[in-house]
């Protein structure tokens, strides 16, 4: 569960309504793979990840980034039940994919950077603070099955 004030919730919802999930999802996942290259081991089937340009232009990275942000959107609609919303994804990433749960925090922070880049002055410190709460809550929910 993420505890947002009514103003924080309104800010998160208003900005998210302007997010191009295809574009931001691909960019966020791509940046994760470039900035934290050890995360690429979970995406070996995606083909060429040999350079930043290859990663950022990879259609499988873009498609999976869109899928990731689709799940994030679901979480935004269920902020009061993030653990329930992400239970199946938590189990998948824990039991089958063996993803280090620290990677969820990294992706959340990268997403915040990408949102700041896309929205500039509209991404105020207050909006960032609200999004940091949300991505921390999502990362915690995704790591739930690890505990």
Swiss-Prot record:
Keyword field contains RNA-binding: no
* Record-listed heme b binding positions: 64, 93
Q: Tell me where the signal peptide lies.
A: none
Q: Which organism is it from?
A: Colobus polykomos
Q: Which residues carry this modification: Phosphothreonine?
A: 13
- Residues modified as N6-acetyllysine are 60, 83, 145
Q: What is this protein called?
A: Hemoglobin subunit beta
Name the InterPro entries on file. Globin, Globin-like_sf, Globin/Proto, Hemoglobin_b, Hemoglobin_oxygen_transport
Q: Which residues form the Globin domain?
A: 3-147
Q: Which GO terms describe its molecular function?
A: haptoglobin binding; heme binding; hemoglobin alpha binding; metal ion binding; organic acid binding; oxygen binding; oxygen carrier activity; peroxidase activity
S-nitrosocysteine PTM sites in chain numbering = 94
Which superkingdom does the taxonomy of this entry point to? Eukaryota
């Amino acid at each position: 569960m993420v505890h947002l004030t009514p103003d924080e919730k309104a800010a998160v919802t208003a900005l998210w309504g302007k997010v191009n999930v295809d574009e931001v999802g691909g960019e966020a996942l791509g940046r994760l793979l470039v900035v934290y290259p050890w995360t690429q081991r979970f995406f070996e089937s995606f083909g060429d990840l040999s350079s930043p340009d290859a990663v950022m232009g990879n259609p499988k990275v873009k498609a999976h980034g869109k899928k990731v942000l689709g799940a994030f959107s679901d979480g935004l609609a269920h902020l009061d039940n993030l653990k329930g919303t992400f239970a199946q994804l938590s189990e998948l990433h824990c039991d089958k994919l063996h993803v280090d749960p620290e990677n969820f925090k990294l992706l959340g922070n990268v997403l915040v950077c990408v949102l700041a880049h896309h929205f500039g002055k509209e991404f105020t410190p207050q909006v960032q603070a609200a999004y940091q709460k949300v991505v921390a809550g999502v990362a915690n929910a995704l790591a739930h099955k690890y505990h």
